[in-house]
């Protein structure tokens, strides 16, 4: 696993010393040696690598990584550029188009968002190939909860975008009045028509950032 560095390492270093993390590290290491696991080990912490703590303006919470070949690269909802765009991201792009008029790109790589301060964080950071939720309950939730708690304590406005019930369960940790919490159903085809479409998270986020003197996010994903 490519280790955390910089601000996130400083903020979360206490977690690495806890028994749950030592158990998690050993379990994940064994899984990578004996099974096909996604994302590639060096990409596990990409959400933290691409978006340093001091630069976080927006947090989008996902669940666990995509579990088919070549998809996951450590950013929730994002896929590598030559991979078919997954259905949930198709719906995110449709809402982005309806909300802000952004062109719908031909790829699903959201690195541009991450580099502008959008932390694309799954609550579980690894998964077995073709087995959704297979690494739930082995310790990742405790680790990512610690990251969410660090974000909650930041003394500056941050937007938390919570899509679907698992993400919305994290709301109990978000009690800092400086932050904005946006909730909607998950963009999955199973639930997008229950209120995800029309929720306008992207324009609401930018309005909040601008109202607080921060540069808005350029949500347009460019062709690569």
Residue ranges: model-predicted function:
Residues 2-3, 14-162, 166-169, 174, ...:
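A polyanion-binding, active-site-adjacent surface
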Residues 5-9:
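Short, contiguous pre-domain boundary segments
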Residues 196:
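C-terminal substrate-binding/active-site "lid" region of AdoMet-derived donor-dependent transferases
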Residues 199-200:
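Polytopic transmembrane helical bundles with strong interfacial aromatic enrichment
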Residues 223:
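Ligand-binding clefts/hinges and TM-proximal coupling segments of bilobed small-molecule sensing domains
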């Amino acid at each position: 696993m490519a280790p955390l560095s910089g601000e996130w390492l400083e903020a979360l270093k206490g977690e690495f010393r806890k028994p749950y993390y030592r158990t998690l590290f050993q379990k994940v290491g064994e899984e990578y040696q004996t099974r096909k696991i996604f994302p590639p080990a060096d990409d596990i912490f990409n959400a933290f690598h691409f978006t340093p703590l001091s630069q976080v303006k927006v947090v989008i919470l996902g669940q666990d990584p995509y579990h088919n070949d070549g998809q996951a690269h450590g950013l929730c909802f994002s896929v590598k550029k030559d991979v078919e765009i997954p259905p949930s991201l198709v719906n995110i792009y449709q809402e982005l188009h309806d909300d802000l008029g952004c062109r719908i790109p031909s790829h699903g790589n959201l690195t541009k968002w991450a580099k502008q301060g959008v932390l694309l964080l799954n609550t579980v950071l690894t998964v077995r190939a073709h087995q959704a939720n297979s690494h739930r309950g082995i310790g990742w939730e405790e680790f990512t909860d610690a990251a969410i708690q660090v974000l909650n304590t930041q003394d500056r406005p941050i937007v938390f975008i919570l899509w679907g019930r698992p993400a919305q369960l994290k709301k109990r940790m978000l009690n800092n009045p400086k932050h904005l919490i946006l909730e909607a159903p998950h963009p999955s085809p199973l639930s997008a028509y229950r209120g995800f479409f029309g929720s306008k998270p992207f324009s609401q986020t930018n309005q909040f950032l601008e109202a607080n003197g921060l540069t808005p996010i350029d949500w347009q994903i460019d062709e690569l």
